[in-house]
Amino acid sequence: MNMRKINFTETVLRDANQSLIATRLPYDKFESILETMDKAGYYSAEVWGGATFDVCLRYLQEDPWERLRKIRAKMPNTKLQMLLRGQNILGYKHYPDDVVRKFVEYSVKNGIDIIRIFDALNDVRNLEVAIDETVKQGAHASGTICFTTSPVHTLEKNVAMVKDLQKMGVKSIAIKDMAGIMGPKDAYDLVSAIKDAVPELPVVVHTHCTTGLAFMTYLKAVEAGADVIDTAISPFSGGTAQPATETLAYALRQLGYQVDLDDKVLVKMADFFKGVRADFLADGTLDPISMATDTQCLNYQIPGGMLSNLISQLKMMNAIDKLDEALAETPKVRADLGYPPLVTPTSQMVGSQAVQNVLAGERYKVVGKEIKAYCRGEYGRTPAPIDAKIQKKILGNTPVVKGRFADSLEPEFEKTKKELGDKAKSDEDVLSYIAFPQVAMAFFEDRATGFKKKKEAAPVKPAAPAAPAAAPAPRAPFAGPVYYAAVPVPQTPGYVSRAIQPFAASYQPSYLKMGDREDCTGNFTITIDGKPYQVSVAKADTPTAAPVAAAPVAAAAPAAAAPVAAPTPAPAAAPAAAPAPTAVAAGETPVNSPMPGNIFKVECKPGQAVKAGDVLVVLEAMKREIEVSAPVDGTVKSVSATVGTAVNTDDLLVVLG
C-alpha cells in the first residue's frame, strides 16, 4: 500500500464561495467556525485574494485587510493562503512594480503564509516581481500554471514554464484548472511531466466540479505524484466549486494514502456551513445553476467564479434569458483574442465582452477599456496572435506595446499616498485605493460615517403574504409622504405604472410602494418573487384619497390577501435613477448609454469641441470601465451624465450639435 501523505487546502473561505455565491460571504457569517477549522489539520486554508478583496470593498462593507487580520488571529496554527494575479495584484489591470512589491509586503505582514501567483496569459514576465518579493518577505511562493486547452497550449510549453518558475525561486508548482476542464489523463500527464522536470518541488492541483471531472482528475493527479489538492467542505462543494473535502479524504485513505485531517472537526464544519448554505439558498444568492454539472463547460471553458458572476450580471440587466447566447459567444471571443486562459482578469474581460456582443446585437460594437488595453499588449504576450481584423476594429491606429508593459509604468505608491492625505488611514488603504479607486473611496467615505448611508438604504424585500380575507376593510388615508420604486419588469406590457402594496408582489408591478419612513429615496436592490431588481426610489405626491380595496388576486397567482390599490403616481413623481432618453433638436446627435452601469467619469463639458472617437463618458459596468465615445465630430450641447449616477441602456448621456 502506498502511504504517501496527501495534503489538503480548504477553499470554503475563498474560491468555493466565490464560485457558488459570487464571493458574498461576509466575515460575521463564518467567524464562529474559524477556531474549529484551525484544528482540522489542513495544509493550508485559502482565505484571501481573488475576488474577495474587490467584493469586501464593493458589497460587504468590510475592510479586506482587517478581514485577513481577524482570520489570522482566529487561525494561528493553519497556514493562510491567498491568490495573487501577478502584475495585476488583485485588480483588473497591470500595476507598477513598486505597487506589486508593497502589496506582497503588506499581504505577508497582515497574515498570509502562502501566495499562489499566476498570470492570466501564463506570461512569466508578469510573475517575476511578485515571486521575487514573496521570497524576500519570507513567504511561500507557489508558481502557477493556468491550465487550459487550445490549439496553441501544449504539454511542452507547460513544462518549459515550470522550469522558468523554478529559476525564479518558487517553493511549489500549482496547476490551476479554473474551469474544471482538466480530465484525468490531462492531470496524470501534466503532473508526471512536472515531477520529471522538477522532482524537488511539491505539486498542487486545483480544479472545479463544473464538468463532473474533478474527482477522477484528482485521483489520477495524486497517482501521478501530486502532493496537495484543493477541496471544499461538503456544503460548499460541487457545482462550480471544488470537490468535497470529506469525500476525497475518505477515497484517498481507501487507496492507502495518508490523510491527516480530523474527521470529527470536518463534521462540525459541515454542520456549520449547512446553515450558511441554507441562508444563501433562501435569499437567492446561491443559484441552482451554479450547483449543476454542466458538460458544455468543456466547450465554453468558463470557470466557476466567472459563471456565477455572469449569471448575477445578466439578472441585474434583466437579461438572464440571454445566458445560453452569452455562453456560446464566449469561446468565439476567446479565439478572437488569441486563446487566453479564462481566469481573472481575462475571464471577466472575455465574459463581459461576450455579454456585450450579445446585448448590443453587433460584435465588438461596445468594447471596454480593459479589452482595448489587452489588444494593445498591456496585459502581456497572448498565447496566439489576436485576430487582426478584430484588433484593428478595437484599436484603430493605436500602436501596440513592445516588451513588458510594467517597465513603462512610473512608481505609484508614494505619489498616491501623498495625494490621498488623511483620506487613507494606512498604507493598506493606499493599496486598496490604487487597486480600486472609485470603490475604495466610496468605502472610505462610508466607513467614516459608520456605514450609515448603506444601513439606511438596506435592500427592501416584499412583506410576507397576509392571511386571505374575504372582504378586506379599506385602509385609512395616509397623510405622510409615499415612495414608489421603479421596477423594470419586462413581463408587464408597456411598463404600466401601478402602485401596489408589497404583499401583492405576484402582480409584477412597474411601481412598488416602498413605505413611509422619513427618507427611503435612493438606489436599492429589491426582490420580487425571488428575482432581484435594481431600483431607484423617488418621492411621490402625497395621496389625497383613501386607498380602495381591489379585486382579489387571480387564481393563477400565489395565495395572498386581496391587494389594496393606491393612487397612481403623478407623472411628476415618476422615479428616475439616471438621465432618461429625451428628444433632441433637429441637427443634434444624442449619445446614449450602451448598457446598464454607473457613471465613472465625465470627460466633456458643454461648449467643448469634440471629434469622432473622443471619449465623452466612462461607465463602470461588470467590473470594467466602458468608454462611451463621440460618434461624430461636433460640439457638446449638453451633458446629462453625472458621476456616481446609475444608468440603463439607452439613457441619454450627452447631446452633440
Regions found by a protein language model. Give the residues of each.
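Hydrophobic faces of well-ordered beta-strands that scaffold small-molecule active sites
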Residues: 8-13, 43-47, 78-85, 115-116, ...
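Active-site beta->alpha loop and helix N-cap motifs at the rims of alpha/beta catalytic domains
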Residues: 49-161, 180-183
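Conserved, mostly hydrophobic/aromatic
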Residues: 16, 117, 173, 225, ...
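N-terminal amphipathic alpha-helix/helix-capping segment at the start of soluble metabolic enzymes
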Residues: 1-21, 68, 73
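Structured functional modules or segments
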Residues: 573-657
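Long, low-complexity intrinsically disordered segments that are proline/alanine-rich
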Residues: 465-475, 545-586
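Catalytic cores of alpha/beta
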Residues: 157-162, 211-224
